[in-house]
Amino acid sequence: MPDVTRQETATRHPLLTRQNTIINDFKGYEKLYMIGGNSGWANMNALIRRSIDDVRLYDERDWKSPQVDVWGISDLDLFKESDRILRALPADKPFFAYVQTAGNHRPFTIPKDNDGFQVSDKTVEQVQAAGSRSVEQYNAVRLLDFNIGRLMELAKAGGYYENTIFVLFGDHNTRISQIPHMAPAFEQLGLESNNVPLLIHAPGLLGTRVVDEAVGLADLLPTLAGMAGMDFTSGTMGRDIQQAAPEGERVVPLVLREGTFPLIGGVTRNYLLQMEHDGSSPTLHDLSSPTPLDNVAEQNPQEFERLRDLTPGLHETSRMMLYQNVR
């Protein structure tokens, strides 16, 4: 569900770390969580251990590889050691594994042992024109792409590539620079931090598809359960994106300004409705417009009315579910 807490993050709240999760509906699966550094960051280990039944959690204390920076071992070493763990599992038992990378996060470390990855010698002007803030960041993103390729090679060599659904996503974005190929709305309406990549890769199982609706990370677990053919019960906000949304065109709730008095939003493929947390000052914005700050509520009264009702409902339901979903 969306984290709509108004102080810190939900994982830091000791009463919210024991949540019902669809992961527990993956009956008969080995469940693993691997992170290159300290799993105690933001109290994540409490959430993982208390919410996921029989989970095997691996962090910096379990790895043989050297730490390269504050985030622990390198992503490449994390992939290699995780691959060895997955290969050692019983061949007839499925697994649900979460591998948390950190290499494209500051300080953008390029480890010495990187399987031949070549740093690109670009100028600051060149990388900033393409959307990166620094040469270091540019090469860190390139390294992440390289490492994902190595992960796929390891999975193929390990014999589990063809029967595995790989999910690649970012937990959040960050302001980098103004990017010409992105619509002005992402910068001017503050959507860049919420706009993250999401790739589901299983060519032998799923084929190919582009989802052009607005979807959120809360939709990820029910979607994966649907793809795996699992029966599941959800007490949270996520929906299987393979199924039609009951509200018609799908709406994703957002928090656009955090804090005690947040600015909340409901985003669709084409529009963003934003309002104060108490429902006041609602405005509707066209995401494809060259002037996205314009309020287009009068030109689109039906969509404005639909989102004006849904947005606070989704936000307040998310707040309630953080407590109602506790096991």
Task: Cite the ranges covered by each PLM segment.
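Solvent-exposed soluble domains appended to multi-pass membrane proteins
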Residues: 1-327
